[in-house]
């Protein structure tokens, strides 16, 4: 499947937010103004239509979680099929992805790095190696780092970095053992207020 391999900062500038969490890993060059649109002089943002606003929000969320368009649409279809609020269901499905859980637990500094740990077979779920980033973690699942991967400096550095972040209440992590428990599905109030999932629902409902 196709995956964007271009400059990630360019996408962050397009969406006006740090999509790939780079600022939490290293200082971003002062010349690279995230709040300024791409282009040498930061082209002025055009006034967006309702559709444009909805599309931008969908693209932002899709890029935050590192999901391709077809896969994102499938997540939406599944969210709409489930009982409850479709937008909230969508975010919960994205939060339940193994690569995201690995990031939330602090084993990877970014979701991209966490996805790499999963694909390189460094992650176990309930004692079994899982190398599928989209694997859905469910309540009470135990996610851990494989023994041979525990020595990786990037994993230790990520855990140190995670100490500076707010700890998710729906997870329980033992940094010394490099393992964590997915205690429950996060509620909407647990997640970022910077995401407007209602715009995505409006977009796909057309």
UniProtKB/Swiss-Prot annotation:
Protein family membership: Belongs to the universal ribosomal protein uS4 family.
InterPro entries linked to this entry: Ribosomal_uS4, Ribosomal_uS4_bac-type, Ribosomal_uS4_CS, Ribosomal_uS4_N, S4_RNA-bd, S4_RNA-bd_sf
Keywords in alphabetical order: Ribonucleoprotein, Ribosomal protein, RNA-binding, rRNA-binding
PROSITE patterns to which the protein is assigned, alphabetical: RIBOSOMAL_S4, S4
Assembly mode: Part of the 30S ribosomal subunit. Contacts protein S5. The interaction surface between S4 and S5 is involved in control of translational fidelity.
Protein name: Small ribosomal subunit protein uS4
Keyword Hydrolase recorded: no
Gene transcribed to yield this protein: rpsD
């Amino acid at each position: 499947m196709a995956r964007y391999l271009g400059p990630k900062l360019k996408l962050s500038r397009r969406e006006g937010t740090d999509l790939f969490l780079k600022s939490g890993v290293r200082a971003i060059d002062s010349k690279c103004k995230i709040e300024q649109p791409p282009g040498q002089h930061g082209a002025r943002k055009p006034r967006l239509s309702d559709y444009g606003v909805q599309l931008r929000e969908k693209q932002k969320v899709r890029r935050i979680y590192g999901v391709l368009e077809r896969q994102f649409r499938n997540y939406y279809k599944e969210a709409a099929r489930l009982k409850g609020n479709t937008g909230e269901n969508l975010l919960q499905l994205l939060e339940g992805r193994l690569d995201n859980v690995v990031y939330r637990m602090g084993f990877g500094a970014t979701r991209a790095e966490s996805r790499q740990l999963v694909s390189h077979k460094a992650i176990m779920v309930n004692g079994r190696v899982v190398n599928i980033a989209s694997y859905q973690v469910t309540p009470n699942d135990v996610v851990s780092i494989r023994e041979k991967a525990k020595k990786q400096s990037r994993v230790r550095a990520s855990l140190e970095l995670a100490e500076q972040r707010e700890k998710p209440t729906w997870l329980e992590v033992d940094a010394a053992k490099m393992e964590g428990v997915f205690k429950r599905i996060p509620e909407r109030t647990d997640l970022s207020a910077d995401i407007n999932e209602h715009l995505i629902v409006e977009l796909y409902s057309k």
